Regions:
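His/Asp/Glu-enriched, well-ordered alpha-helical/loop segment
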Residues: 1, 5-28, 32, 38-42, ...
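Extracellular/periplasmic ectodomains of large secreted or surface enzymes and adhesion receptors
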Residues: 200-205
Length: 205
């Protein structure tokens, strides 16, 4: 669902299915959501559809400036990767990498989500800065949001008693630094179900 028509028709399909079958915990999600018409943004919350996105592309890179904006025009370009608007409309967000098309590094993805500028191009102008997210919302999309859309929110995605200890420890507090430096953070420990699976100090990891 990259185009706004694809998004609208997908939302229409979910709405029709709910009318025919009644409500259920289906957790439908639309991936990519590069263009979402403003009229359709409130429908995500109304229908319980998750906005599943990969924020690394939400910046002024060649894919946007050379292959997208000249062809879709200024009207549609004004609602490209509208994460901020979707969040304000009450949509639940789930973020991922889209690897191998995009970087698998969530810290780089996070920096774009909060700045709309790529870490390797920090001097660039942001893409639609009003669509940037605060760090807490972006982190929740990568963690709790992704767990929710995969029906794993009872097991992982947040630090709560009884949930799996799936934890990444960084070398700095992301909330204590400039948002433009998020991607500079380094992982010092990764735990999966409480077991250490990565540390840069351990040979072979």
């Amino acid at each position: 669902t990259i185009g706004d028509r694809a998004v609208r028709e997908s939302l229409d399909a979910v709405e029709a299915a709910q009318r025919a079958n009644g409500g259920r915990d289906a957790r439908h999600h639309l991936a990519h959501i590069q263009f979402v018409h403003p009229e359709d943004m409130p429908r995500f919350r109304k229908l319980g559809v998750v906005a599943n996105a990969q924020p690394y592309r939400a910046c002024r890179e060649a894919y946007v400036t050379e292959l997208t904006e000249p062809f879709v025009g200024p009207e549609r370009s004004a609602y490209m990767y509208p994460f901020g608007s979707l969040h304000r409309a009450g949509a639940r967000l789930a973020f991922g990498s889209d690897w191998t098309v995009s970087t698998p590094d969530p810290l780089q993805q996070l920096e774009v989500a909060v700045n709309r500028i790529r870490p390797d191009d920090r001097g660039a102008d942001p893409l639609l800065p009003d669509e940037a997210l605060d760090l807490g919302t972006a982190l929740a999309a990568f963690t709790a949001g992704s767990a929710y859309v995969n029906f794993l929110d009872d097991e992982t995605g947040s630090l709560e008693p009884g949930k799996l200890a799936d934890i990444v420890v960084l070398d700095r507090d992301l909330f204590g630094i400039d948002g433009a430096q998020v991607a500079d953070a380094r992982v010092v420990l990764t735990l999966i179900e409480g077991e250490a699976v990565y540390s840069p100090s351990e040979p072979g990891w």
